[in-house]
């Protein structure tokens, strides 16, 4: 919607550009998710997975869209500040305990206030699941991946 063929790395200038693009399209992103859900929902149950900003969008989609069966949110930075939202589907969240952008005390408050949301924390940093980042943690990524597959199997199959 904003710029074609955007592919960003994880260096400082790319992250800065990504934040600017996010600010320009936050509202439209949920509309795009809704359109994608609509497109595939005739095939059966639909789930979403997001990482970082996408993790926050997956949380928002779970709370604002009623035709989702599952949502998986990896280290969504906005999630603790959206604690007032109530999901309409089953949700699984993954957070890194060493993530300085998402304070673990806020994650704990979120977890306590949302007992129906499966929330896991890992001894890892933000981006622990991305093998293109220095924060990648193979062990934690594997555990989170296995939990994600199990969750999706339970909720989509």
Enumerate the language-model features and the residues they cover.
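N-terminal cap/leader regions of alpha/beta-hydrolase-fold enzymes
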Residues: 1-157
């Amino acid at each position: 919607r904003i710029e074609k063929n955007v592919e960003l790395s994880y260096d400082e200038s790319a992250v800065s550009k990504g934040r600017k693009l996010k600010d320009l399209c936050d509202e439209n992103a949920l509309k795009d998710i809704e359109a994608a859900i609509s497109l595939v929902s005739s095939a059966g149950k639909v789930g979403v997975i997001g990482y970082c900003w996408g993790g926050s969008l997956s949380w928002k989609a779970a709370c604002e869209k009623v035709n989702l069966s599952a949502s998986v949110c990896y280290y969504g930075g906005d999630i603790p500040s959206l604690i007032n939202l109530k999901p309409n589907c089953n949700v699984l969240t993954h957070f890194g305990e060493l993530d300085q952008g998402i304070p673990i005390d806020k994650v704990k408050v979120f977890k306590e206030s949302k007992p129906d949301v499966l929330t896991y924390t890992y001894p890892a940093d933000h981006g622990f699941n991305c093998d293109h980042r220095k924060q990648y943690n193979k062990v934690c990524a594997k555990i989170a991946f296995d939990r994600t597959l199990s969750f999706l199997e339970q909720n989509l199959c």
